[in-house]
Amino acid sequence: MTHTNEHDHKAEQQQNGRGDTTTETVNPQKMKLVTKLLIDNKFGLMDDLNFSIPLTASSEGVPISAKTSELGTEYLKNQQENSVSPILPISRSTRIKADRVRIYLDYYYNILERCISIDSSQNHHEGVEGVYNPLQVIRNRKLKKKHHELPTREFYTTKHPIIAIKQFSKKPNKKMPWFVDINEKYMDLTWRTSHWEELVDPQGKLWFQSYSPSNESSGSSSSRRHHGHHIHPRRHLQHHSRVRTANSVHSNTQSLTPKRVMTNEEDNNNHNNNNMITKIATTPEAQISRNKKSDLNLSHIHLEVPITNTVTNTSSDQGSLIIEAKGSSYGGDRRGSSNTSGSGGKRNSKHYRSKSAGPPENEKSRMNGLEKIISKTSKGWSRSPKKNTPGLEKQVLLNPTISNGGTSRRSSNNGESISTNSSKSSMGITFGNTETYKTPVDNGKDAIIRQSLLSEVPVHTLRGKTSNRSLRAEGEQALESDKELPNGAGSIYEGAPREKTTSQGSEPVGLVSDSLQVDEQLQRYWHDTRYIMSTVAMMQHRRETHDIVKRREIARRNEIEITQDADTNIRKTADALTQYDNELNKVLKLGNDWTSKLLNDYSIRVETLISSSDRILSDINTTLTLKLKMFQENTERYVTVKVMRAQKMTKTIYRLLEFGIVLVLWTIWFLFSVLRSIRFTIFLVLKIIKALLW
């Protein structure tokens, strides 16, 4: 007994567990909702097909069908309460019209909502913005008519719905109707943004006397204002273009204007009898005038030396450079040197003059005329970057100074000797004691042909204390190497001349050649070597300064200013990170739970729901197909009944015709039989009379 009871108890627990699982997996409310949706779809389909179930009314007013009459009225009442209310039969055209009106009203209320729902911060026009006022639209309509601003043409792809105020008014086509349409409302919103100063209030006064801050660029009322509104932007554009042009001219002026030449105090003290060296500031007009000269006259290169050298580069057909150095020397000694070249045997002379002496008169007058012409068109040249580029390339001021080392042979200046490089990085301005530097290739002409071997190396000026120091060190090394040469041979460093020609009076003196012989090939090799060494030193110094600046910038960026307690910040950060990790673990756990539920529980529920919905849909499809077949059978039966009724009618007619014919024949037979009987009776009476008479 106990064993059987335990077995029954286990079976009940299993059944309860199954029931719990079924209740957990299936939600009756969702099933009801799905069933209602399917039934609604069914009735909608039946309504579209104009198919209805024939029902018979009971005594209590409850419709009873033939199949469900056996269940009773109570069941039918409950079913009627829980069932969906029947849909009224509405035609398709009525639904289309109702949908059109609904879309119209939704659009209208959407526009009204956009007009009214404006934040107070954006509402700059109180009384007009953020207010639904169709009377204001009608007043704006009058203003449009006053200024002949006709409304835009309206296009309708479909018929607009019937508006009652237009449809049932006495005059539907008024010029000024008291009705605001959607299109008019929308156009009024656009129109009033440029006519705020013309809007009129109900008293006939202007709403806004002047422009509001948000509408400075809006239009105005009259045609004059409209015209000005279209013209002012061009004036502003012209003004801005002039400002930009001025800025570009100013920037070009700054770019074209080189730095001033730095003079030497020792040079001023030592050269008391000579003219003072003035500071040169090249203007853009003079720069452009020098750039616009003929191809034979290139720009001058100003050298920062106590004896200022003006180098004039004259390009020949073969591309050679004829170099003249002009300046003033110190003291009354006048010494010139000249030497003949190896092949040509001609003399290359160098003339020195002071910079304060200025150019010749004819050249000065030509420069003034060109400057007057160029000053008129300087704006057009300043705007073009291509026209300003050659000027920047042709004139470069170099200011690295090199210490002299105390030798009197260098120059009269005891302080520094300046090295010069051209903007093209080497134009070959190297001078010997007796002649200008020439390349190993010589064609025997008077001009010195300089190949582009050294011009391939780019050399840029380094301005600064560090560059000056490095160049001074290079200069000292050059002086030490110069001391080893004979007294007659002059030392050259990067093309800096060191000859003395004229005195204060600039009197011409015959050139005196040195008594000592100089190896020209060795001197050229030495010049090339010193030039390349100086170039490499300058480039190395530039790389070192660039590395120093880069390291400083990286160190400045990597500096972190800690203004608070670092330990407290670290502790707070650690606490925040731990809290974040805990919250993240909670969220991950919750997400894992949900994923497991979705994969395990809800997947089963979804499968059961899908299977039940498929079953219900299949039942609905079968019922619909059966009903459709019944409908088809009924229609066919109706056709056959009509045919059968037609056959019965003809049969009755034929029978009536037959009966009539038989009746006529029987009447004829009856008549003949009556006549025959009458005849027989007459003959019988005659015979009886005859017999009696006899």
Curated annotation (Swiss-Prot):
It is found in: Membrane; Cytoplasm. It is a single-pass membrane protein. One of its GO terms (cellular component) is peroxisome. Residues 1-12, 471-485 have a biased composition (Basic and acidic residues). Residues 211-222, 403-417 have a biased composition (Low complexity). InterPro entries: MTC4 (IPR038769). Residues 223-243 have a biased composition (Basic residues). The modification Phosphothreonine is found at residue 263. The modification Phosphotyrosine is found at residue 493. Residues 1-26, 211-287, 325-437, 465-511 are annotated as: Disordered. Disruption phenotype: Shows a slower growth rate on YPD and minimal medium at 15 degrees Celsius. Synthetically sick with temperature-sensitive CDC13-1 mutant. Present with 396 molecules/cell in log phase SD medium. This is Maintenance of telomere capping protein 4. It comes from Saccharomyces cerevisiae (strain ATCC 204508 / S288c). The lineage of its organism: Eukaryota, Fungi, Dikarya, Ascomycota, Saccharomycotina.
